[in-house]
From Swiss-Prot:
It is found in: Cytoplasm. Belongs to the thiolase-like superfamily. Chalcone/stilbene synthases family. The keyword Signal does not apply. Its EC number is 2.3.1.74. This is Chalcone synthase H2. The gene is chs_H1-132.
Length: 389
């Protein structure tokens, strides 16, 4: 008779969890940041709030965002005037929209990832779906399983309302699933649609206005598994370790409340300051075991909550400007897509490395770090190992 130890050994993978494919998708509706203040104040019937509009223009100018993608078109907003008010009961309209659109956008990204992976979708054993938009039962994980035609026995995990750090969380969870279940192939999807947070401007709630200047829609999907099949599966990054922590003295720094008026955000403290003050501790904990203490020797993927966070992290750690190139590029081209951002940055980095003829998927370097920052203040730290190109 076999022992429990033997069973456990047989169940576990040999090597580390590895990202085997990446796919991304956005809604078709593209919005230029330079034109957005005029559009936003017009569509929300707020053109009389001239001072507020000037303030919003400055926010948009400083955002370092060139364009964003949004499911909400002018037509949809005209049909749903309560979404354009500052605080009108609108949760039904918002939810009815996102419970359909979130899995749909997720399917687009997942289809691209599955195609790149090159394996039959029947080999997907687990689904991890993450969104801060739209809650129904059965959830977006179920809807995606149906839309893609995955096996009914696929093991699903649904993560709701995690916020901007969750791109790191899904990697941490997928790593554990892949390494503890031999042969597991995990489909990870982050799909975010801002229809749940869009609202008109108000003088008393400037935090909301910051969100209106930064947030965009997007979906990213990964296939993650350990022990890649040689010649068939092509590793992109290895997931070496993953940690989560709540920053000290950060209670209420970022809060989100899902109520009748939709999802409202409150930024109550100096978020960039809190992150930059504490980030080195997370780096030391993650990289000391590897004997790494030069943060410029790493490739960097950081959730671009906004330009101030990136500027302060860069300054605090004395990072060379090129370290956050991929991160700033994604912020500029898509805005802050919450949990999906860091996965878009992974995609941008590996694409640019191949284009530039670099030796590895991590800008020619061996080791890298991925950071997620969000409500809590919660920080996810993932240690990545690049793969030779």
């Amino acid at each position: 008779m076999v022992t429990v130890e033997e069973v456990r050994k047989a169940q576990r993978a040999e090597g580390p969890a590895t990202i085997l494919a990446i796919g991304t998708a956005t809604p078709a509706n593209c919005i230029l940041q330079s034109e957005y203040p005029d559009y936003y104040f017009r569509i929300t019937n707020s053109e009389h709030k001239t001072e507020l509009k000037e303030k919003f223009k400055r926010m948009c100018d400083k955002s370092m965002i060139r364009k964003r993608y949004m499911h909400l078109t002018e037509e949809i907003l005209k049909e749903n005037p309560n979404l354009c008010a500052y605080e009108a009961p609108s949760l039904d309209a918002r939810q009815d929209m996102v419970v359909v659109e979130v899995p749909k956008l997720g399917k687009e990204a997942a289809t691209k990832a599955i195609k790149e992976w090159g394996q039959p979708k029947s080999k997907i054993t687990h689904v991890v779906f993450c969104t801060t938009s739209g809650v129904d039962m059965p959830g977006a994980d179920y809807q995606l399983t149906k839309l893609l035609g995955l096996r009914p026995s696929v093991k699903r995990l649904m993560m709701y309302q995690q916020g901007c750090f969750a791109g790191g969380t899904v990697l941490r969870v997928a790593k554990d699933l892949a390494e503890n279940n031999k042969g597991a192939r995990v489909l990870v999807v982050c799909s975010e649609i801002t229809a749940v947070t869009f609202r008109g401007p108000n003088d008393t709630h400037l935090d909301s206005l910051v969100g209106q200047a930064l947030f965009g829609d997007g979906s990213a999907a990964l296939i993650i598994g350990a022990d890649p099949t040689p010649e068939i599966e092509k590793p992109i990054f290895e997931l070496v370790s993953a940690a989560q922590t709540i920053l000290p003295d950060s209670d209420g720094a970022i809060d989100g409340h899902l109520r009748e008026v939709g999802l409202t955000f409150h930024l109550l403290k100096d978020v960039p300051g809190l992150i930059s003050k504490n980030i080195e501790k997370s780096l030391v904990e993650a990289f000391k075991p590897l004997g790494i203490s030069d943060w410029n020797s790493l490739f960097w993927i950081a959730h671009p909550g906004g330009p101030a966070i990136l500027d302060q992290v860069e300054s605090k750690l004395a990072l060379k400007p090129e370290k956050l190139r991929a991160t700033r590029h994604v912020l500029g081209e898509y805005g802050n897509m919450s949990s999906a951002c860091v996965l878009f940055i992974l995609d941008e980095m590996r694409r640019k490395c191949a284009e530039d003829g670099l030796k590895t998927t991590g800008e020619g370097l061996e080791w890298g770090v991925l950071f997620g920052f969000g409500p809590g203040l919660t920080v996810e730290t993932v240690v990545l190992h690049s793969v030779g190109i």
